[in-house]
Amino acid sequence: MIYHEIYDVIVVGGGHAGTEAALAPARMGLKTLLLTHNIDTLGQMSCNPAIGGIGKGHLVKEIDAMGGLMAIAIDQAGIQFRTLNSSKGPAVRATRAQADRVLYRQAVRTALENQPNLDIFQQEVVDILVENNRAVGAVTKMRLTFKARSVVLTAGTFLAGKIHIGLDNYAGGRAGDPAATMLADRLRDLNLRIDRLKTGTPPRLDARTINFDVLAKQHGDAELPVMSFMGSVDLHPRQIPCYITHTNEQTHDLIRNSLDRSPMYTGVIEGIGPRYCPSIEDKVMRFSDRNSHQIYLEPEGLSTIEVYPNGISTSLPFDVQMGIVNSMKGLEKTRIIKPGYAIEYDYFDPRDLKPTLETKAIEGLFFAGQINGTTGYEEAAAQGLLAGINAALQVQGKEAWFPTRDLAYTGVLVDDLCTLGTKEPYRVFTSRAEYRLLLREDNADIRLTPIAHELGLIDDARWARFNQKMENIEREHERLKQIWIHPQSEHLAVVNELVNSPLTREASGEDLLRRPEVTYDKLTQVAAFAPALDDKQAAEQVEISIKYQGYIEHQQNEIERHKRHENTLIPAEFDYDKVESLSNEVRAKLMQHRPVSIGQASRISGITPAAISILLVNLKKQGMLKRGEL
C-alpha cells in the first residue's frame, strides 16, 4: 500500500540525528515525515546522560545558533551544569550538562509534536525506495510505502546491531530495542562501502544501594551556565551533585582474570570501539601501570534510582560486572539494575558522502549520525541538522550549503569524515580544529545565525534577540573607545588598583581591557566605565574580541591565505591518470577519494604539498582552474 500523501523529506530514525534532521526541513516550511520504530523513545539517551563537553559543547552551540533543538532541550532537562576549562582561554572553554533522561526525552518529543509541517509515524523501516538511482521513499515493516522527494537515514546503532554480554550475544539496536536487520540487508545491496564498529555502555546502578556518605561530591558551577543562546537559568530543573569513586587493584585483577570471557579479547567482537571512550577492560590492559581509574557516578534523573557509572563501560559477563562494581569504594553492596554491554553495528564509509551528507551513489539519500562512523549525541545531532538542511534545499531546487572548517566545528567534523574517513568511532575535539580561536562556543551565533536566517531556519524571536545582541556589542565597543583615563584623572587611583603597572599615559577603556589582568566586570565597576551591559552574552563578546584582537586577526589572515586555494574546485570529470607527474600512489588515492576541492585533496593522508602544486598546474593547463562555493 502507498500512503496517500507525498512528503518533501522523510527522516528514518528518531534519535539525536533524526530529530534535528526532521525539525530542520519542517522549520524551512517543507512537509516532513519522521519514521521511528517507537515514538516513546524519541530523543532517547542510549548511553551517558549528558550533553556537551570539550568540542561537543561547541557543536551544541552551533546547532542552537541555527535553530536546532538540543541546547534548548538540555536547558530544560539539565540537572548539573559546568563550564569545563573555565581557567583556560575562550577557545577551549566548553559547557557540559548532566541530564535527567526523562525530562530530556519529554522536551524532545514535545518539540517534535508541536512543530508545524512535521508528521510522526511509528513503524520500522525495512527498505529505502530507490528509482533511477534516486531515493524516493521508504517502505515499512507492514509494507506501507511512504513517498518523498528526499530521504535522510539516521539509523544509529540499529543496522544489523548485535549486543554482547560476555560470550553471549543477540540481535538488538540497543538494550530493549530490536535491530534493523531487514533494512541493513537491503542497504548492503546498494553501491556503498559498509563496515562494522563497536560501542559500549556501563551497567546501571541502584542509587538506594550506594553508600554516598563515603564518596567525594562533585557539584555544578555556582554561577550556572546555559546551553542555548535563547536559554535561561530559569529553565533549569533542580540541580544535584554527582559523586566520585575509583577502581583499585582488586578491580583490575578481576578484569585481567576474566579476559577469557570477554567478547573483545576472545575475538568475538570484530568492530573497533571508540578510542576516547574505552571500556574498562581496555583501560586496565592499555594502562597497566595505573592502579586506579576515576569513576563518576552520575544520577540519571530526579525521579529515578538509576545511576550511570561513567568510566566502566564493559561487555564482560554479568557476574564479572557485579564483581567490578562491588570492588569499589561506596559500591560494596550496590545492586546492578541493567547490565553493561557492547554493541556492534553497520556503518558506511563517510568518504562515499558529499560534504552535504548526501550519498555520492544515490541522489536524494542523505546519511547522518553513527551510521557515518561517529560517536556521541552531539556529533549525531550536528550531522542530522546539516543533512536535514540539504535535503530541504535540494527539494527547493536551491544551492546546497555546508560549513567550512573555518566557520564551524560541524565543518571540521564533516570535512574530516568525508575527506579522511574513519576506522574507529569519530568524536570531535577542539584539537581537531586548526582555527579554534575563531570557533568558540560564545560566538557560534555570530558565525551561524545570519546563515540560518537566510536559510529560513530560525524564527523572528531568535532573529530579533540576535540583532539586539549585535547592537549591544557595537555600542559597547564604541562607548569603551570614547572613555579615556589620563594620569591626572580622579579615577586614576581606582584604575591603578586593577592593573599590574600604574598608568603613565592616557588610556581608553579598550586599552585597559586589552591588559590580561583587567576583566570587563572589574573595569565596569570603576565609575568612569560604568554601567556594565545587562546583556551578559554581549559583554562576553566585547571582552573576548578586545582582549584577543591580535590573535584573532592573525588567525583570520591565516585563513585568507589558506582560502586562496581551499575553494579551488576540482571538476568531477578531472582525469588524474593524465597527470603523469603524480606518483601512482597519489593518483590512486585521489581517484579513490575524488576530492571536490584542493582543500579536500590537501587533507588526504599521503597527498604532499608538491602533489597539490602539480594538481594546480594541471588544472590551469586544462582550463579547469576556478574558485567557487562548494
UniProtKB/Swiss-Prot annotation:
PROSITE patterns: GIDA_1, GIDA_2. The keyword Transcription regulation does not apply. One of its GO terms (cellular component) is cytosol. InterPro entries: FAD/NAD-bd_sf, GIDA_C_N, MnmG, MnmG-rel, MnmG-rel_CS, MnmG_C, MnmG_C_subdom, MnmG_C_subdom_sf. Its cofactor is FAD. Keywords: Cytoplasm, FAD, Flavoprotein, NAD, tRNA processing. NAD(+) binds at residues 273-287. GO terms for molecular function: flavin adenine dinucleotide binding. FAD binds at residues 13-18. Pfam families: GIDA, GIDA_C_1st, SAM_GIDA_C. Its main location: cytoplasm. GO terms for biological process: tRNA methylation; tRNA wobble uridine modification. It is found in: Cytoplasm. Belongs to the MnmG family. HAMAP family: MnmG_GidA. NAD-binding protein involved in the addition of a carboxymethylaminomethyl (cmnm) group at the wobble position (U34) of certain tRNAs, forming tRNA-cmnm(5)s(2)U34. Homodimer. Heterotetramer of two MnmE and two MnmG subunits. This is tRNA uridine 5-carboxymethylaminomethyl modification enzyme MnmG. The gene is mnmG.
